């Protein structure tokens, strides 16, 4: 990654944050990929640029629902030209917010950890669901299933809505739930018109200096969401998706124990993953 003259204040699984001043920071999406909470050694070329374009598209598309972390500044306003040229497609200037300490997950379809919970208990995060649902079943309505935020390298844990209220307070929990579902519904309706089913997604929210709930980080990318193609979707099977599921599936069959270090990912698996990300961008924004 490019060295920047700004001070790096945080390095996450995929994004690095740099300090601009006490109100703003620069968020740079790298080509790193994490799977099963382990950062893989092999970067995915152009992934950071594609994620940034998809996220920026959704921030603008959903701006009528709630405020977001954009400041209106460009990278050229905060970096020397030669640095800005290198990161312009993968970096955004954003507000410094106080992050809300939960992952706001909305599910419209049943799969993944939600399906496992449902098969055991008939519920997800304490929410009772109808009987007879199977892999990839559409849920009667989108559900808010929060999880606790883990440190880098730890696993997020699904929590009930009551636990969510305890963590962030009942008033904020109600606001987060309402906004998360509204964002999902608007995005899912739009994506469907482009041939994409948004199975589930994770939103990140923060509070600005006035306490206003603000959408932040990344929005509805293949890293934070499961996208399925309308053409290959059918109930009862796990549909192929436009995201890192392709690499996750390869890792599942590689015999890896899911502890660092991760195995080396073959070039063709990396290439197919890049193509999946690019296809999602093309479909959504065409």
Curated annotation (Swiss-Prot):
From the record, give the transmembrane residue ranges.
none
Sample GO molecular function, one term: phosphoribosylaminoimidazolesuccinocarboxamide synthase activity
InterPro entries in the record: SAICAR_synt/ADE2_N, SAICAR_synth, SAICAR_synthetase_CS
What Gene3D superfamilies does the annotation carry?
ATP-grasp fold, B domain, Phosphorylase Kinase, domain 1
A single GO BP: 'de novo' IMP biosynthetic process
Q: What class of enzyme is it?
A: ligase
**Protein name (Swiss-Prot/TrEMBL):** Phosphoribosylaminoimidazole-succinocarboxamide synthase
What species was this sequence derived from? Answer: Pasteurella multocida (strain Pm70)
Q: Which gene encodes it?
A: purC
